[in-house]
């Protein structure tokens, strides 16, 4: 497996486009379409927020069919908390895309992101979808990625190539997300395309596992959104022997490439946390169970006191062990070890009295890793997050959600 350059059009048989439909006040790209020239196995996971948006309800039904061919997306309006009209608008968005592409409506996923509680500007949206369909091309992957952004500061995309059954297989993905990031799936839109041949039921299970290893290990601010969706389309044009079960000899290579692509995108979202100045990796080891390791890591990653300490470049390790302690994870206080940037600060639950000046260069870095051993077992987990800055408050004070 190797990392490569490419957009969602890198795998065989995929076209995409993003256009400016006038939904965003900024005038930026705001409508996108991704299209597979042949039916593709699909797998998706969606927000766990009980106030899920209309497009999530529609797309959940698409996912049940096992096969799909297109994804239609708009940014600038979430179509959430919009009642029956919102649901009707999402279905119209789906039907319009399907008609233009000459496929069945149930083969089209729909996604929206942006301001909650407002109706979609349907005239602009439908015109935008038509323009995007007219613009579909292998060379329009970047414009597609631009069109799904809201408060993002950079385009998020990743691509990998691997060999499966003697065939070259490509995985490529795009994502958006910068705020309201918290499992399970939160203010993230993620679309991954691949030309691997895999059975729909196998793909569905793999997507869920991949999300648990990547996007569900990212925290920016602890808020869970209404619209999050991770959708994977696999059209089989690589012509490898179809992967029919997890026991297939090629399953592991397929799954590793899917996770690699998803993990890259997840880390980019943490890097792009609203107002972030630091990318933080929280490693928990020595846990009694994986669930405990994740629980402790999440508590640390979500803690405003931990996040603001890193923004201030203050090695306040007490906040880290405190968060682990109240997380509910099993731990042995007199066996806890903690390091930041490889420098041991706590040994067997006691202060190592490291001079602040020794830690200053580490705390000044953009990417910082911390590791805490709970002393309770052998399990581990890693969560990615960012700091909290003045800019985060400014952005969310000014951005109308």
Which functions belong to the PLM regions below?
Residues 1-74, 78-88, 95-401:
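A structural signal for small-residue-enriched, beta-sheet-centric alpha/beta enzyme cores
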């Amino acid at each position: 497996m190797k990392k490569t350059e490419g957009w969602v059009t890198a795998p065989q048989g995929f076209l995409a486009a993003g256009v400016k439909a006038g939904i965003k006040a900024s005038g930026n790209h705001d409508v996108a379409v991704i299209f597979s020239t042949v039916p593709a196995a699909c797998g998706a996971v969606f927000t766990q927020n009980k106030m899920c948006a209309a497009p999530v309800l529609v797309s959940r039904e698409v996912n049940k069919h096992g096969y799909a061919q297109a994804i239609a997306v708009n940014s600038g309006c979430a179509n959430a908390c919009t009642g029956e009209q919102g649901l009707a608008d999402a279905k119209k968005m789906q039907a319009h895309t399907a008609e233009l592409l000459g496929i069945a409506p149930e083969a089209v996923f729909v996604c929206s992101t942006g301001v909650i509680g407002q109706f979609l500007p349907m005239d602009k949206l439908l015109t935008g979808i038509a323009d995007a369909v007219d613009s579909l091309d292998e060379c329009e992957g970047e414009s597609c990625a631009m069109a799904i952004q809201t408060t993002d500061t950079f385009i998020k995309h990743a691509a990998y190539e691997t060999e499966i059954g003697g065939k070259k297989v490509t995985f490529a993905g795009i994502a958006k997300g910068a705020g309201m990031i918290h499992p399970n799936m939160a203010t993230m839109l993620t679309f991954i395309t691949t030309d691997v041949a895999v059975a729909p039921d196998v793909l569905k299970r793999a997507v869920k596992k991949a999300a648990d290893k990547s996007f569900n290990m990212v925290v920016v601010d602890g808020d869970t959104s209404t619209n999050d969706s991770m959708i994977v389309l696999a059209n089989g044009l690589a012509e490898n022997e179809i992967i029919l079960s997890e026991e297939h000899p090629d399953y592991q290579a397929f799954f590793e490439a899917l996770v690699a692509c998803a993990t890259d995108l997840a880390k980019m979202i943490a890097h792009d946390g609203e107002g972030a100045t630091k990318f933080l990796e929280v490693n928990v080891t020595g846990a009694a169970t994986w669930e405990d390791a994740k629980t402790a890591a999440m508590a640390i990653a979500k803690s405003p006191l931990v996040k603001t300490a890193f923004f201030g470049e203050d090695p306040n390790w007490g906040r880290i062990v405190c968060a682990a302690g109240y997380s509910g994870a099993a731990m042995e206080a007199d066996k806890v070890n903690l390091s930041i940037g490889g420098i041991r600060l706590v040994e067997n639950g006691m202060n190592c009295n490291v001079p602040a000046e020794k830690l200053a260069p580490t705390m000044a870095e953009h990417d910082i890793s911390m590791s805490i051993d709970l002393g309770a077992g052998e399990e581990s987990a890693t969560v990615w997050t960012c700091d909290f800055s003045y800019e985060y408050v400014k952005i969310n004070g000014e951005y109308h959600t």
